[in-house]
Curated annotation (Swiss-Prot):
Record protein name field: 2-phospho-L-lactate guanylyltransferase
Origin species: Methanocella paludicola (strain DSM 17711 / JCM 13418 / NBRC 101707 / SANAE)
Subunit architecture: Homodimer.
Keywords: GTP-binding, Nucleotide-binding, Nucleotidyltransferase, Transferase
SUPFAM superfamilies to which the protein is assigned, alphabetical: Nucleotide-diphospho-sugar transferases (SSF53448)
MF GO annotations: GTP binding; phospholactate guanylyltransferase activity
InterPro entries listed in its UniProt record: CofC (IPR002835), Nucleotide-diphossugar_trans (IPR029044)
PANTHER family noted in UniProt: 2-PHOSPHO-L-LACTATE GUANYLYLTRANSFERASE
Domain of life: Archaea
Known pathway: Cofactor biosynthesis; coenzyme F420 biosynthesis
Record-listed E.C. numbers: 2.7.7.68
An example Gene Ontology biological process: F420-0 metabolic process
Keyword Nucleotidyltransferase on entry: yes
Length: 220
């Protein structure tokens, strides 16, 4: 079985630009990808990267200039076996999480992201299904499964729902991460527990002067 991982090769994780430099965002995105592909392979899946530009990586690469939904739906329409679609920014996901999804009796297993999104889908009959990401895609995918006559299971998991999009999301990676992305983040970012909600802040004792995009203060 294959796991398709959409991966943005240019200007990755731009919403983290307030706290991370372009080089840091690029490296973090690559390490999150490494963590996720490692988990997928350990769970017995063959990794396929879906990108908009050629990219050197130890995996099958599918390059498409189409939008995300069109590119994924092209892949699903030609698939002859079950397919997992997993986003490249959920580095907390574990082998057990993936195996639990694969073991579900449902036709489609959907793991929601925060804010109504969809982080992972496991589709047993891909030619009967299509995806519709962006917006409240979790609700859209549940509807699509029903309209297609497919049973759907919601996979409720903190690990799978923790996507790293905003600065505040880095807190979860810093606290709970066990992979290379978390190790990298901890080399220059620390937790700010001084007041209210926990935040991340740049650790000036670990970062050479001039490397960071702003002052060493907690993220907003």
């Amino acid at each position: 079985m294959k796991a398709v991982v959409p991966f943005k090769t240019v200007n990755a994780k731009s919403r983290l630009s307030a706290v991370l430099t372009a080089d840091e965002r690029t490296k973090l995105a690559r390490l999150m990808l490494d963590d996720i592909t490692g988990v997928l392979r350990e769970a017995g899946l063959k990794v396929v990267l879906l990108t908009t530009a050629p990219f050197k990586y130890d995996a099958e690469i599918v390059v498409s200039e189409k939008d995300l939904n069109s590119a994924l739906n092209d892949f699903l329409s030609s698939a002859s076996e079950p397919v997992m679609i997993i986003m490249a920014d959920i580095p907390l996901i574990t082998v057990k999480n993936v195996r639990d999804m694969l073991a579900s009796p449902a036709d489609v297993v959907i793991s929601p992201g925060r804010g109504g999104g969809t982080n992972v889908q496991f589709i047993k009959e891909p030619q009967k299904y299509h995806v519709d990401y962006y917006g409240a895609s979790f609700l859209d995918h549940m509807r699509i499964a029903g309209d297609s006559g497919l049973t759907a299971e919601v996979f409720d998991s903190f690990n799978a729902s923790s996507d790293i999009d905003e600065a505040q999301d880095l807190v979860e990676l810093h606290i709970h991460g066990k992979g290379r992305a978390a190790e990298y983040l901890r080399t220059f970012m620390a937790l700010d527990v001084s007041k209210g909600r926990v935040k991340v802040m740049r650790d000036v004792q670990k970062v050479p002067e001039g490397r960071h995009p702003g002052r060493s203060v907690a993220t907003q």
